């Protein structure tokens, strides 16, 4: 009976961790990554279109992203979209290909990004704890309605806490990995 409550809690905690992973891909490290451009929208015949749907993105070198537009006339639109996205990147074009050189991050910027990552981790932990609270409330409701015994309630709450601890540890690991990646020169 209480397994459904725990399953629901795991699902909520999974969402918090997945959201954190997705958010962390957008955090700029010293390395080039096409995920930096995920939110860049290009005006394609009057329709805002994701950059990866109007050209091929590649990372030929650790500090370089190249964009090969599928239509040459989109070069200027893509450059404009990158400037508008305010990523701190300056696109250069040779008429066929757009190059984005990722500048090395300053020490101050690295520390700033580390703080951002820690904040993301804390937000994810809040999501995990919220799922725990909902699960504990669900367990208490089951016990109140006499669907489970008091022993089952205690056992369930302990299991929920164990699951919560494992997810918090997973979040801490993700945050420390990303911080290490940011501080790497």
From Swiss-Prot:
It is found in: Cytoplasm. Residues 127-156 are annotated as: Disordered. One of its GO terms (cellular component) is cytosol. Gene3D superfamilies: 3.30.1360.40, Ribosome-recycling factor (1.10.132.20). The keyword Coiled coil does not apply. GO terms for biological process: cytoplasmic translational termination. InterPro entries: Ribosome_recyc_fac, Ribosome_recyc_fac_dom, RRF_sf. GO terms for molecular function: ribosomal large subunit binding. Keywords: Cytoplasm, Protein biosynthesis. It comes from the Bacteria. The keyword Electron transport does not apply. HAMAP family: RRF. NCBIfam families: frr. Responsible for the release of ribosomes from messenger RNA at the termination of protein biosynthesis. May increase the efficiency of translation by recycling ribosomes from one round of translation to another. This is Ribosome-recycling factor. It comes from Syntrophotalea carbinolica (strain DSM 2380 / NBRC 103641 / GraBd1). The gene is frr.
